[in-house]
């Protein structure tokens, strides 16, 4: 709070990184800030291009007509421009990562199906950085509609269900 430029937050995480490097030199710190420039400055080894803000990653996978959907009418240019800008600002400082999902967003399979999912995963897995696959996305796990919100889950609750195994595993 009251740290609009995150200077104090960055200093705190730099201190934690210093300790981590001394005690656990093989460990890696992963941020969920969605702001690689700031988080890498803060000492994290990697950060995501999250679905909010100016990354435009939502345009690829989760908007009304995502880029990787067969019905897509959008373009990839806003994402590419944001990605290039982030690459320039973070070059050599750490990894900027793509993710299939997390506990805060709809499941990928809620918006993409079949070959669309395959192409989206090919994209995620071939981008520079470290790909992050949210549990279940690798088997096309679906968003579970109608689950009761628990502990502030709201519309995210359907992405937080247990692994949906079936007889094919």
Q: Where are the predicted features?
A:
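Aromatic- and acidic-residue-enriched carbohydrate-binding clefts of CAZyme catalytic domains
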Residues: 1-7
């Amino acid at each position: 709070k009251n740290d609009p430029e995150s200077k104090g937050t960055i200093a705190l995480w730099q201190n934690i990184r210093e300790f981590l490097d001394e005690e656990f030199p093989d460990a890696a710190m992963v941020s969920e800030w969605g702001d690689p420039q700031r988080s890498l400055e803060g000492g994290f080894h990697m950060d995501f291009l999250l679905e909010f803000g100016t990354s435009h990653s939502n345009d690829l996978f989760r908007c009304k007509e995502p880029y990787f959907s067969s019905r897509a009418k959008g373009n990839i240019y806003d994402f590419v421009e944001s990605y290039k800008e982030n690459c320039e600002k973070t070059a050599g400082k750490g990894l900027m990562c793509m993710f299939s999902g997390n506990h805060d967003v709809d499941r990928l399979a809620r918006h993409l199906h079949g070959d669309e999912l395959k192409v989206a995963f090919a994209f995620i897995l071939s981008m520079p950085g470290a790909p992050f696959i949210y549990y279940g996305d690798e088997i096309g796990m679906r968003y579970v509609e109608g689950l009761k919100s628990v502990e502030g889950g709201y519309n995210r609750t359907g992405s937080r269900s247990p692994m949906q195994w079936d007889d094919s595993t």
